[in-house]
A protein has these predicted regions:
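Ligand-binding loop in jelly-roll beta-barrel domains
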Residues: 29, 88-113
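Short strand-coil-strand connectors
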Residues: 26-27, 70-74, 95-97
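Short, conserved beta-strand element in jelly-roll/cupin
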Residues: 52-69
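A short, polar/proline- and glycine-enriched secondary-structure boundary/capping micro-motif
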Residues: 43-45, 79-81, 111-114
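Short, surface-exposed beta-strand-loop junctions and turns on beta-sheet-rich folds
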Residues: 39, 75-77, 107-109
Length: 122
């Protein structure tokens, strides 16, 4: 059994108010601590992925704020106090400062992170 903290988790991406931390949790899954500043829209960074959307599933919990999740069929807003499952094919936008923790399949998550970093030039 394992436990993780935000401070003990390595930074995967940072800049512009983003301090995205991720580590392998075991069983082919990773845990991520993700604060997103209000107005952060990941759609531009997802361009080039299938459907221009994140294709990695995520299970998580919103600790703070509100986040809009856009899909090919519409959108839904999630807010503090809600647990979620986001299936493949989504693009998040922070409507307020957001703080989430989520669990995702490592291989799929790493592919999306690598793509986002490449889009950002890093």
């Amino acid at each position: 059994m394992t436990a993780f903290t935000r401070d003990g988790t390595p930074v995967a991406m940072e800049g512009g108010g983003l301090d995205f931390r991720k580590r392998e949790a075991g069983g082919g899954m990773s845990v991520a601590f993700i604060p997103l500043p209000e107005g952060t829209d990941l759609a531009p960074a997802l361009k080039g992925l299938d459907g221009d959307l994140c294709q990695c599933p995520h299970w998580g919990y919103v600790f703070k704020g509100r986040i809009r999740m856009r899909t090919a069929t519409g959108e839904e807003v999630y807010e503090a106090g809600q647990a979620y499952y986001w299936g493949p094919g989504h693009a998040p936008e922070a409507l307020e400062d957001v703080d989430v923790v989520e669990f995702s399949p490592t291989a799929e998550f790493d592919a999306v992170i690598d793509h986002v970093k490449a889009q950002a030039g890093g």
